[in-house]
Amino acid sequence: MNQNLTYNINLIGGRDWSKFKKWYIRLSLRKYLKLNENPVIISSNWELSEGLIPYRNKYKFCLVTVLHGLEVTRLQSKRYAKRTKRFVQSILNSDHVISVSNYTKNQAELISGYKQNKTIPNFVNTKKSFIVDKKKSRRKLGFKQSDKILLTLSRLVKRKGHETVINAISLIINKIPDIKYVIAGSGEEKYEGDLKQLVSKLKLDRHVLFLGYIEEDNKNDLYNACDIYIMNSNKTDEEGDSEGFGITFLESNACGKPVIGSNAGGISDAITNRENGLLIEPNNPTKTAQAIYELFNDEKLYNQLSENGITRIKENFAINKVGEKYMEIILNHYDY
């Protein structure tokens, strides 16, 4: 590959992408394709790629479709099954298909039969996720310095498994009386109500804190204020929603935090068991409690996972490392 090539990057935006994405992408790129020779289009969604199918025989361009998780796994549910044919056509009309995890890759191959799918993980933006002083972050957020804090930062939906962590805390509260579980994120009101009822039933009101929606600028302080990041996601729900990757595990690692996650969906791509965190069974409060207790009581293991996590981010998930993998595919496509 020629490492001295220069290139221009253009970001295509638009209004109300969720409803009209394939029409917006078609209108946005028509003029661009006319004026530029052999461009590379990296599409962040298969429905965007679908919008470019009519241009495949008219213009010469390299189409790279990136698959994340939900947009693939939900095709297995009754509600979204009708989209399967469109998905397959979108994949087959792409020059390259990249999945952010092996789990997403396998699901896409199962549905489409396309076997040239490659795996390149999401990157961690280390300008947004980085280590700062834990005491300062706790003071800023109003957390006690003595608390042992677990954090889940995610959409507030049942598949994320918050109730498993709450039940796990009830099993070890006598052994770790200063434990606090911080639930950050908004979502389904009914699910939030169910979680709060469970907290009251287990008499954990002083140990579980609901923060609601979190602004992007506050996320790094949350990661740094916690001791352990945890998310015990379920394998899938009735809508086909599953964890395609789990970027919050890696953002936590970048802040020096060990992580605990369930062996579900693409989480095993984000967590290597006993290297940067602990992988446990989903929906298992006992196993979850054991993992929490182990990390809070084994300082050597805690520090080892913390250090490994930081190193792993730098070596595998930094933006330059992930970018090199994309560039390799693009440059090889045109044989530069």
Task: Indicate where each model-derived feature is located.
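Conserved donor-binding/catalytic core segment of Leloir-type glycosyltransferases
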Residues: 144-160, 166-169, 182
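Short His-centered aromatic/hydrophobic patch
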Residues: 43-48, 67
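Acidic donor-binding loop of glycosyltransferase active sites
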Residues: 224-242, 257
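Carbohydrate-associated surface elements
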Residues: 103, 123
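Short hydrophobic beta-strand element within catalytic cores of glycosyltransferases
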Residues: 249, 254, 258-261, 271
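Nucleotide-activated donor-binding/catalytic signature segment of Leloir-type glycosyltransferases, i.e.
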Residues: 193-217
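Conserved acidic donor-binding segment of nucleotide-sugar-dependent glycosyltransferases
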Residues: 272-274, 278-285, 294-300
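A short helix/loop element that forms part of the nucleotide-sugar donor recognition site in Leloir-type
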Residues: 130-143
